[in-house]
Structures are given as C-alpha cells and as structure tokens.
Amino acid sequence: NVNRRYMRVAKKEAYHHGDLRSALVALALEHVRKDGAESFSLREAARGAGVTSGAAYKHFADKDELLSAVATEALALLAQRSMKATAGLNGRKRLHASALSYIDFAAAEPRLFRLAFSRFGSDLRTEKDGVPGAFEQLRVAVAELQTDPGKPVDPDALALAWAVVHGIAARISDGMWKKNDPRVEAALRLSFKGIAPGK
C-alpha cells in the first residue's frame, strides 16, 4: 500500500528531525480518520513512531491531550478547505461555498469532524499556525450580507447560519443524511433567506 509506505517514511523523517510531537499527532490523526478515537492509545502512537512510551509522554500527558491536538489539526483542515472553497467569492456565494465546504468536510472526514466538535463544541475560533478559525469564512459572508457591512456581525444571523450548517453536517457525519440529500440545499436556502432576505 503506497499510502502506508508514505506514512512510514513521513513518521521516520519527522522523528529523525526531532519533531516527535508532530509525528505522534499525524499518527493519531490517521488512526482517528480510519478507525475513530475510541480504540486509540498514546502507547500505540509511540509504537507507530518507533519510540518508547516514555518519549511520547514527554510531549503529551495522556491520550486525551493527544486527541485534543488532533482535534485542533482537524479544525485547521476544515479552515483550509473553507478558505480554498471561498477564494474570490463574496456575499451569498461566499456563504453558500463556505456552508458546502463545512458539509463536505463532515461527509469526507466524519470521524475527525466528530472528534473536533466533541472537543471544542461550537467554538470554532481555534487558530493554529496562522490558519483562521474554521468558521471564519461563514462569519465573513454573514457580515457581507448585512444591511450595513461596516457594523459588527449580527450575532443572531451568525448563530442561525452556524446552527443550520452544523446541524446538517452533524447529520451527515452520523450517517443520518447523505451529502446529496435534497433537504441539504432546501435547509440552506431557507436559512440564507432569513440571514439576508433582500439579497
């Protein structure tokens, strides 16, 4: 398997250069992505990186701390996806693209999505390495659609946008809806009318 060989090389390279912490996070992220967070352990991450448990515990106090780091990485991936999807767009087009990128992430990475929100809940302001919070493009779009874009973003409009988008994404990540379910576009369309009825 080419992907597994690549991961082994990446792990060895990361540790060789002294970046064991990043190697452990990468290993844990791949495990969560494929099998979920429940069956993972810090000792397993250490074995995967080819180091002792003691070496791993120098970077993470326990499994919970490692999984929090993985959740932060998951939010960074979501933010990157959102930024790419909304590049060059504004207003309603940005809002729609941002919402779909969020939903697409939940469909493509359901286990990472669930882990991220089990750790951070609705607080999507987490930033890492200069990457804006996962919800930033949705917030910017809501602000652009306000009657007076110069004013602070309307918290009620933002809450509505997040509640609808996150609700859809959660249903998809749990397997209750499919990404192409007609209710997805219907729910987005209705919520967008509530956010910017005249635009």
Language model region names:
Residues 96-117, 125-132, 162:
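Helical hydrophobic small-molecule/effector-binding pocket
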